């Protein structure tokens, strides 16, 4: 082999060795950490780099297969050992190596171009983010990539705040952002400024506090620095805006220019010295004394007036020593000051305390006066209502009150008549008394007939309003939904015709129009009732044409009105009325709710019977019982009814599902009041039933006849405030009350059985909700029909 060939072989070998060394160099760790390449692109670059390294290693192993000892020998020995055939193989091998080297270098240049492109795109995709910590109010400005997920930002601040990252929440413009969302999804472009808020979802357990590492008003900016010839790196730098005044460490001032030259200076805030905790050791508890003279160095000097320097004495002050006082005088002065302060404070505190007592007394007297005024007003209102009931009786209770007053008057008159001396005078007086009583009963009967007619008209109007009302539902939000059906519209049309029939003082033409409308409405159905109505309409029209006066037609018009009411109450002509009839059309529905009255010999529904908890069978209806009371005893149950109503209201307010109280009837409460409690308060013996209430003896136990006490309203309020009955009352009084409870339990022993039988009955719940003062409005939730 010639010398040029040897040189070419040596150069190529050295060149391949150099290429192998360049390719086998691993990627710098700082470059890998500084680059912000996306995960997908980073994986692609890593795969390409791995493949290139494998190819280079394969070629390097093949090219460097000769031992190192051969490389150390002289070049002449290497060429002398080769033959002609060996030189040809080596030429082919060198050509292959040169071709592979060019491909590898081209591949490495592509990888480098991809990295530079990725770094440039990452550098250009950064936005400035202003983070506000809530509620600390600290603002931090830092760069952040627009395509990076928010979870990186959340983890960064979780590390700074020492809070778990899942507790932190980030919002942008009031919208909570997700962990995998980025700024670019919210329309943020690179190089823009955006503000986000960071707060804690558990502020009590993990509060957001200020970051002590960052000073007030600090900002974080990104600075590009050059780390090598063709390599740049971005570094986050914190700008601290602080009003820290650097200490003066000595220096001098130039007299001519006035410039100050300092011996030393600083630009950063000194580190905060951490506070030491309390030490519990010998050094803090033991005093070591040492006698040693020490002269401090004079580090400062006083500038006085001299040549070239003038110091003004305008601000100088002349200090004079005060009067000397001893320690005893000092302590005496302090003691006098303490006495003055305590005296003033005690006087001020006493004035405030007396003023508060005066205000409390004034409020108490005003409250007592208001209560007395309310009681007087209630008494006057009760007397006024009693007077109104006697002169304008409307309800059954009003007529009971009249019959009771009549009976009391009769008994007084009989007592006076019994004092007459002769028998003839007594008989004459009794006959006269009987005649007066008969006249009063007749007067009461006339009032009852008028009241019955008014109630009947009002009941008919209420019945028609109920039938013509649309179906109403209440939604969950409180609003109502109304719906009219063909049946409600039909009922409303019949109601309007009925109201027109009742109108008076109409002209003849208007009356004829109403009758014509009624005739067309009734003619739609043919039956005996409609035929009778049509005949009466034709008769009224005929009489009106003959000039009959209106007051002579009142009976005929009343018959038409009555028959038309029967027409409206017929479900065949008015289907909506079927839901409100007392007697249903299907006999099987009321088969189990019909009872026989042994007094009037009528079959009546169960609501017409008053069943007492102590009764064993249904015997007489309400009407027969009231009739017997009017003819014989003439008792008034109005006061007992009010007492029972107050019991219902008080038990409904407890809300503990009491049962027995709502089973009590008028006869039961009357027996309990008169026979057990003697119609008077158990404490004060007050006998006015209008002021008495029946409350629980033990407020923690359900009301029952054997767990009650009859007291006045004020006494009941004080009784229910007692924490313990045994401590609030004496032993003798408690024994007397328990004896009354035993008597009541023996009489009402059947009530617990009835209460257990109707435990799931809805009627008791309806009564409780009716008398409850805290019951919310009933809400009907509409449900959609499920597809089959």
Swiss-Prot record:
Gene3D superfamilies: Phosphatidylinositol 3-kinase Catalytic Subunit, Chain A, domain 1 (3.10.20.90). Residues 127-203 form the Ubiquitin-like domain. Keywords: Cell projection, Cilium, Cilium biogenesis/degradation, Cytoplasm, Cytoskeleton, Flagellum. Residues 334-363 form the IQ domain. Residues 7-20, 68-78 have a biased composition (Basic and acidic residues). Residues 80-89 have a biased composition (Polar residues). Residues 1-89 are annotated as: Disordered. Disruption phenotype: Leads to an absence of radial spoke 1 (RS1) complex from sperm axonemes. Leads to flagellar bending defects in sperm cells, and consequently abnormal flagellar beating and asthenospermia (reduced sperm motility). Male mice are infertile, no effect on female fertility. Elongated cilia. Increases levels of phosphorylated MAPK1/ERK2 and MAPK3/ERK1. GO terms for biological process: cilium assembly; epithelial cilium movement involved in extracellular fluid movement; flagellated sperm motility; mating; smoothened signaling pathway. InterPro entries: IQUB, Ubiquitin-like_domsf. Expressed in the flagellum of sperm cells and cilia of tracheal epithelial cells (at protein level). High expression in testis, also present in brain and lung. It is found in: Cytoplasm, Cytoskeleton, Flagellum axoneme; Cell projection, Cilium. Component of the axonemal radial spoke 1 (RS1) complex, at least composed of spoke head proteins RSPH1, RSPH3B, RSPH9 and the cilia-specific component RSPH4A or sperm-specific component RSPH6A, spoke stalk proteins RSPH14, DNAJB13, DYDC1, ROPN1L and NME5, and the anchor protein IQUB. Does not appear to be part of radial spoke complexes 2 or 3 (RS2 or RS3). Interacts with CALM1. Interacts with DNAJB13. Interacts with DYNLL2. Interacts with NME5. Interacts with RSPH3. Interacts with RSPH9. Interacts with ZMYND10. This is IQ motif and ubiquitin-like domain-containing protein. It comes from Mus musculus (Mouse).
